[in-house]
From Swiss-Prot:
GO terms for molecular function: acetoacetate decarboxylase activity. Its EC number is 4.1.1.4. SUPFAM superfamilies: Acetoacetate decarboxylase-like (SSF160104). It catalyses: acetoacetate + H(+) = acetone + CO2. Keywords: Decarboxylase, Lyase, Schiff base. Pfam families: ADC (PF06314). InterPro entries: Acetoacetate_decarboxylase, Acetoacetate_decarboxylase_bac, ADC_dom_sf. This is Acetoacetate decarboxylase. Gene3D superfamilies: Acetoacetate decarboxylase-like (2.40.400.10). The active site is at residue 115. Catalyzes the conversion of acetoacetate to acetone and carbon dioxide. It comes from Clostridium beijerinckii (strain ATCC 51743 / NCIMB 8052) (Clostridium acetobutylicum). Belongs to the ADC family.
Length: 246
């Protein structure tokens, strides 16, 4: 391969890249979202400045993605924390677990999604929408919601999906010193809502050293939503460079 061609490649291995080029379009993406109140002091310890806490809430999200351009079919689970940045409301993505290697690789390399390998599932059990997460063989989370009990306003569903996502991008140099340390923002685009529902929900988190979702304990369920949508991942942008701060 010519030297001029090397920099044109998206990632390694060159003969079989870990993921294809985007954009990444999601068809029939299914969300189970549960917003709950948690411990404010616990949130203060993990949300990085200059983000500001909006309230002592966490959004537990489970996403089934059966048809993703270039990445295939997979399921993802994680926690997002409502925040504000320069007056703009969005969600800080705290941790994400999924069962698809290309999606993990592209999320970490091409953006700043805090993705790790896990085993989430989203399914219907009789009249209940169920989301479960395992890390290795151990249970980490179980979420339940009545299946399509009450319609959710489509504008509200759109607003939930369209919120900006804030993430940390941290890469060390070969000398062990920070090479990249940035706050990133990305938004979903080309959103189409196919259906949305709300209803009663419960969430149980189990302590795990390497999947510490339970460190943000469930004190009260605030709301829940079940949303079917198509969307495209937006291009991430840098909003704050920690290494440029004197």
């Amino acid at each position: 391969m010519l030297e001029s061609e090397v920099s044109k490649q998206i990632t390694t291995p060159l003969a079989a890249p870990a993921f294809p080029r985007g954009p990444y379009r999601f068809h029939n993406r299914e969300y189970l979202n549960i917003i709950y109140r948690t411990d404010l002091d616990a949130l203060r310890k993990i949300v990085p400045e200059p983000l500001e806490l909006d309230r002592a809430y966490v959004r537990f999200e489970m996403m089934a993605m059966p048809d993703t351009t270039g990445l295939g079919s997979y399921t993802e689970c994680g926690q997002a924390i409502p925040v504000k940045y320069n007056g703009v409301k969005g969600d800080y993505l705290h941790m994400m677990y999924l069962d698809n290697e290309p999606a993990i690789a592209v999320g970490r390399e091409s953006s700043a999604y805090p993705k790790k390998l896990g085993y989430p599932k989203l399914f219907v059990d009789s009249d209940t929408l169920v989301g479960t997460l395992k890390y290795g063989t151990l249970p980490v989370a179980t979420a339940t919601m009545g299946y399509k009990h009450e319609p959710l306003d489509l504008k509200e569903a759109y607003a939930q999906i369209a919120r900006p996502n804030f993430m940390l991008k941290i890469i060390q140099g070969y000398d062990g010193k920070p090479r990249i340390c940035e706050l990133i923002c990305a938004e979903n685009t080309d959103i189409t809502i196919h259906g949305a529902w709300t209803g009663s929900a419960r969430l149980q988190l189990f302590s795990h050293a390497l999947a510490p979702l339970a460190d943000l304990p469930v004190l009260e369920i605030v709301s829940a939503s079940h949303i079917l949508t198509d969307l495209t991942l937006g291009t991430p942008k840098v909003v704050h460079d920690y290494l440029s701060v004197k």
